[in-house]
Amino acid sequence: MMLRLLSSLLLVAVASGYGPPSSRPSSRVVNGEDAVPYSWPWQVSLQYEKSGSFYHTCGGSLIAPDWVVTAGHCISSSRTYQVVLGEYDRAVKEGPEQVIPINSGDLFVHPLWNRSCVACGNDIALIKLSRSAQLGDAVQLASLPPAGDILPNETPCYITGWGRLYTNGPLPDKLQEALLPVVDYEHCSRWNWWGSSVKKTMVCAGGDIRSGCNGDSGGPLNCPTEDGGWQVHGVTSFVSAFGCNTRRKPTVFTRVSAFIDWIEETIASH
């Protein structure tokens, strides 16, 4: 699941931690490629129940042993969810997977999120797991940036997820990764880019031939730190309704550093 802004948007349905993945991504990513298994160990698959089976709908990031951050538009109070940690190839049971049910009362969507106004922002939600994750090589915590942190233009970040391989295409079995350089607010908010649809509580990345797509929603925008680690700076929110890789329409993410206080307060009170 990923949102699309109708006149030109499409929703993509992305704590202290370990930071660095076990293998750095390839610099040859263009439209996305298979990630190295378990190289993004905070990535989760959010799945919903239908007719007795569970289906992938969004990504997310494990930010505490019993908490996941995802997109607000990924959550519906009428659905039953589970989270799968330690997932890589969804078609194969590989061993590290941890399937954790979600109680209906443990879904916390940002109070200002408005499904009918994607461009208003606040597309973020927290999920409390019914039991704590068992951390290890395949399951680790994401690092989050300091409150208010803004990435410079062209910071080389990576989107990860099981979203569609191209507009209206299939969902992949294996976790995908793609290099998405940051597009700063000055550029992304220009009239012939996203214009006023982009707010300062968002971060843009990629555009042209690289982007997120349906199924990537809620998953992380992983950005490098000076010490060689990674921080989750974005939660995948929307792309263009004209297609997942429309020129001058970078993927738009909820900027995590704008919501650190809300994240901390929500976790502390539950």
UniProtKB/Swiss-Prot annotation:
The keyword Hydrolase applies. GO terms for molecular function: peptidase activity; serine-type endopeptidase activity. Residues 1-15 form the signal peptide. The lineage of its organism: Eukaryota, Metazoa, Chordata, Craniata, Vertebrata. The keyword Disulfide bond applies. Its EC number is 3.4.21.70. It is an enzyme of class 3 (hydrolase). PANTHER family: CHYMOTRYPSIN-LIKE ELASTASE FAMILY MEMBER, CHYMOTRYPSIN-LIKE ELASTASE FAMILY MEMBER 3B. It comes from Homo sapiens. This is Chymotrypsin-like elastase family member 3B.
